[in-house]
């Protein structure tokens, strides 16, 4: 009987030890899990805090422009109206280099000798004021070598001005075909330079679409909004019509149709449904301009040739006919392999169905190797090779469009 009691107590002790071990393991596991949870939570919280701090300078704080003082801390220079009035010669007509729906752009020289482009927003109408706020809020956080840089701003009473870097060679369109005010003296760009510009413009759009959350839709990309510096490096400009996309999957904005004839995507023109693929279509039109040297819409041409996309699209995928669309000024500068590759990219970008168009990241990846093999090796300390088929033009003095 005593032996049975000893055996019973041994079993009880074994069970107790087992329960204690499992309980200890469970508690330890819970502690580890809780510690990991706290670690992850703190890590995420820090990221959110950093993100909030980074973007807080661009948040809208009521209808006033007091937040511009915060934006100034992010590297933008604050100008007085008197300074900019002096820089532009009293906003004289001789210094006007662009006009738009929300104001005019003037050539200016600051006291330190820097050349700038100054956008004077229209004082009449609420829309102009809202446009100013949108541009400042966007541009204070959009920084890329392929986007036009905002140097500073002025906000005094009813005076709202933006100060941009000056682009010595003006808009891309000035170097592709004759335009009013250029007197046909603007130099034509060579093949290598056109492809380089195509890549840089694509990188600008890629940044807006892929590296900003939520993505920014330009909505009015065109050759006149792709500006060239003194070395013919390209930067995308004019975010006056830019819209922040939805943060939902496949984000889009629905709004009244704005844009420029010949560049507007079909689905946007018909429904007002705007997505990043709408920008891709506009980019495709610019790519066609680079290939053909033609304006997007010219009803003075022969029947069937007035609309660039309609005329070029059937030829872009035909190896025998694709050469028919090429700008005569480029003759002898390209290989058929290069033309076919670029034509294929353009054809995908201007597809009528938005879903069939590529992402701008795909466009960039397609152009990078092509441009790389065409560009000569640049020695350290020397500038990149950018060329025109004529001498530099004194008429190319444009900077951002209004």
Give short role names for the model-derived ranges.
Residues 313-355:
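C-terminal lobe substrate-recognition/regulatory segment of protein kinase catalytic domains
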Residues 241-243:
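Activation segment
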Residues 152-153:
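A short, aromatic-enriched beta-strand patch in the conserved N-lobe beta-sheet
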Residues 203-216:
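Protein kinase catalytic-loop region centered on the HRD/HxD motif
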Residues 11-138, 142-148, 157-163, 169, ...:
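Membrane-proximal cytoplasmic juxtamembrane segment of single-pass receptors
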Residues 1-13, 18-27, 45-66, 70-73, ...:
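Intrinsically disordered, low-complexity cytosolic regulatory tails
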Residues 279:
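Conserved catalytic-loop aspartate of Hanks-type protein kinases
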């Amino acid at each position: 009987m005593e032996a049975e009691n000893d055996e019973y107590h041994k079993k009880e002790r074994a069970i107790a030890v087992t329960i204690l071990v499992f309980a200890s393991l469970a508690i330890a596991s819970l502690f580890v899990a809780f510690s990991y949870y706290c670690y992850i939570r703190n890590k995420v919280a820090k990221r959110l805090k950093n993100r909030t701090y980074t973007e807080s300078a661009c948040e809208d704080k009521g209808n006033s422009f007091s937040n511009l003082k915060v934006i100034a801390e992010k590297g933008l220079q604050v100008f007085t109206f008197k300074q900019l009035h002096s820089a532009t010669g009293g906003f004289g007509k001789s210094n006007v280099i662009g006009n738009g729906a929300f104001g005019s752009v003037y050539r200016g020289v600051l006291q330190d000798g820097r050349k700038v482009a100054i956008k004077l927003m229209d004082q009449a109408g609420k829309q102009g004021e809202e446009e100013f706020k949108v541009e400042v809020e966007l541009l204070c956080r959009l920084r890329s070598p392929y986007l036009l840089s905002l140097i500073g701003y002025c906000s005094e009473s009813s005076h709202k001005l933006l100060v941009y870097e000056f682009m010595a060679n003006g808009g891309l369109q000035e170097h592709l075909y004759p335009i009013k005010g250029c007197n046909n003296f603007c130099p034509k760009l060579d093949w290598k330079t056109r492809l380089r510009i195509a890549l840089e413009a694509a990188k600008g759009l890629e940044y807006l679409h892929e590296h900003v959350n939520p993505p920014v839709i330009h909505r009015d990309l065109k050759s006149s909004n792709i500006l060239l510096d003194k070395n013919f490096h390209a930067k995308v400009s004019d975010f006056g019509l830019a819209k922040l996309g939805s943060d939902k999957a496949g984000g889009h904005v629905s709004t009244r149709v704005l844009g420029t004839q010949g560049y507007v995507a079909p689905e946007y023109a018909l429904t007002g449904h705007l997505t990043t693929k709408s920008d891709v279509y506009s980019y495709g039109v610019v790519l066609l301009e680079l290939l053909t040297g033609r304006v997007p819409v010219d009803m003075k041409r022969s029947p069937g040739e007035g609309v660039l996309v309609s005329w070029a699209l059937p030829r872009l995928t035909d190896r025998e006919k694709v050469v028919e669309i090429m700008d005569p000024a480029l003759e002898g500068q390209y290989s058929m392999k290069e033309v076919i590759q670029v034509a294929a990219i353009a054809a995908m970008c201007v597809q009528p169905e938005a879903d069939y168009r590529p992402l701008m990241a795909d466009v960039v990846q397609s152009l990078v190797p092509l441009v790389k093999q065409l560009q000569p090796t640049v020695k350290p300390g020397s500038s990149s090779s950018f060329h025109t088929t004529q001498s530099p033009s004194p008429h190319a003095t444009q900077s951002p469009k209004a």
